Structures are given as C-alpha cells and as structure tokens.
C-alpha cells in the first residue's frame, strides 16, 4: 500500500495570515494531502485580518493538529509527512526552530523536518529585521530550511492583495516542486 505523504501547513501569530490562507487553498487545488496547525494567536489574527472563523480554513485540511498537543503523530520522525510550511512565521517561532527549542508541537514538527532532511519552508513576516532575526534565518538555512520571506514581486502587475499573496503562495509551491500558475512568470519579454 502506497502512503500519500502529507504537507503540514502551520500558521503562527504574525500579521499576514492571508499568506497561509492562499497557500492552503493552492495546496488544496493541487490535490495535496494537507495537515493544518493554527496557533491560538493566529486564530485571533485570522478573525481580524480575514474576517472569517479559523474553522473555515480547517475545513480545507485533511487533518488538523493542535500546537499544544505533544502526542500528535507529526512530532515523530516516523510520521510520513514530506514537508512543512510555516506561513506566516513569527520571529519567536523562527528563533525556537533556529535554536533547537521544540517548545510545542509546531516547533517539534519543524525540528523533525530538519533532523529528517525534509523540506521546511518558513515565510517570515516582519519588518524591519534585527540582526538576531537575520542570524536565526541563516541558522535555519544552514540546517537545510528554506527561508522564503513575504516579499512579493511586482513584475506580474498585481491588481489586489490576493495577487500579491498568491505570488508568495506560488513561490512556496515552486520550492516544494508542485506545479502552479498562481502568478504570471517573468519571460523577459515584458519590458
């Protein structure tokens, strides 16, 4: 029997939950098996920024995980998930991952990704950045994690906030090797 490996999407308490929402919808559209984890603070920000209840996003996932539940399957390297995306990623979460501090199920699952050499994609959403933020990003990158900052391009002429968020969602799917058409690709013929 073939196991279809899941991609974990975690949303933490930074502004920019639209990035997590658009990534979730893109993964669903691509037919990917999705495990979703939303922190308590992210739940409040979803209500504020998106004007929806977090349950509306949870309905799109195949499985939901609680960040405070250390007994969840994704806390083990034997769990057959293939990648994890944290979008948006707070600086606190980044720091915990960079320093091997698995304080909850979310940071433990990220730790599993790094130790098992699975894809870990962090979408930090903070500006400006302190030196320690940059150092933590470098640490995660050196461990094999992918830092994909929420810095959308503008060559595709975004007409909405959703277009800008889809640019980042498309880049996340790109690094995971999932084909997508979430934004117009640069051809060099546009100038």
From Swiss-Prot:
Q: Does the keyword Signal apply?
A: no
Q: Give the Gene Ontology MF terms in alphabetical order.
A: carboxy-lyase activity; flavin prenyltransferase activity
Q: Where does dimethylallyl phosphate bind?
A: 155, 171
Q: Where are the transmembrane segments?
A: none
| EC class | transferase
Q: Which residues form a coiled coil?
A: none
Q: Where does FMN bind?
A: 13-15, 39, 90-93, 125
User: Which residues form each disulfide bond in the chain?
Assistant: none
Q: Which reaction does it catalyse?
A: dimethylallyl phosphate + FMNH2 = prenylated FMNH2 + phosphate
According to its UniProt record, the EC number is 2.5.1.129
Q: Which family is this protein grouped under?
A: Belongs to the UbiX/PAD1 family.
Q: What does this protein do?
A: Flavin prenyltransferase that catalyzes the synthesis of the prenylated FMN cofactor (prenyl-FMN) for 4-hydroxy-3-polyprenylbenzoic acid decarboxylase UbiD. The prenyltransferase is metal-independent and links a dimethylallyl moiety from dimethylallyl monophosphate (DMAP) to the flavin N5 and C6 atoms of FMN.
PANTHER family for this protein: FLAVIN PRENYLTRANSFERASE, FLAVIN PRENYLTRANSFERASE PAD1, MITOCHONDRIAL
Q: Identify this protein by name.
A: Flavin prenyltransferase UbiX
Species annotation: Methanothermobacter thermautotrophicus (strain ATCC 29096 / DSM 1053 / JCM 10044 / NBRC 100330 / Delta H)
Q: What is the lineage of its organism?
A: Archaea, Methanobacteriati, Methanobacteriota, Methanomada group, Methanobacteria
């Amino acid at each position: 029997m073939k196991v279809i490996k899941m991609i974990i999407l975690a949303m933490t308490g930074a502004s920019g939950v639209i990035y997590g929402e658009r990534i979730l919808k893109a993964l669903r559209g691509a037919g990917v098996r999705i495990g979703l984890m939303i922190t308590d603070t992210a739940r409040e920000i979803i209500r504020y920024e998106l004007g929806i209840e977090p349950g509306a996003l949870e309905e799109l996932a195949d499985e939901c995980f609680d960040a405070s539940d250390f007994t969840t399957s994704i806390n083990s390297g034997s769990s057959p998930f293939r990648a994890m995306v944290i979008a948006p990623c707070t600086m606190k979460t980044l720091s915990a991952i960079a320093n091997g501090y698995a304080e909850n199920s979310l940071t433990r699952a990220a730790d599993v990704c790094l130790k098992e050499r699975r894809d870990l994609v962090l979408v930090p959403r903070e500006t400006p950045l302190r030196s320690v933020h940059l150092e933590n990003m470098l640490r995660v990158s050196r461990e094999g994690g992918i830092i994909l900052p929420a810095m959308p391009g503008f060559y595709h002429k975004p007409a909405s906030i959703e277009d800008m968020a889809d640019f980042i969602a498309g880049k996340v799917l790109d690094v995971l090797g999932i084909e997508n058409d979430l934004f117009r690709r640069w051809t060099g013929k546009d100038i």
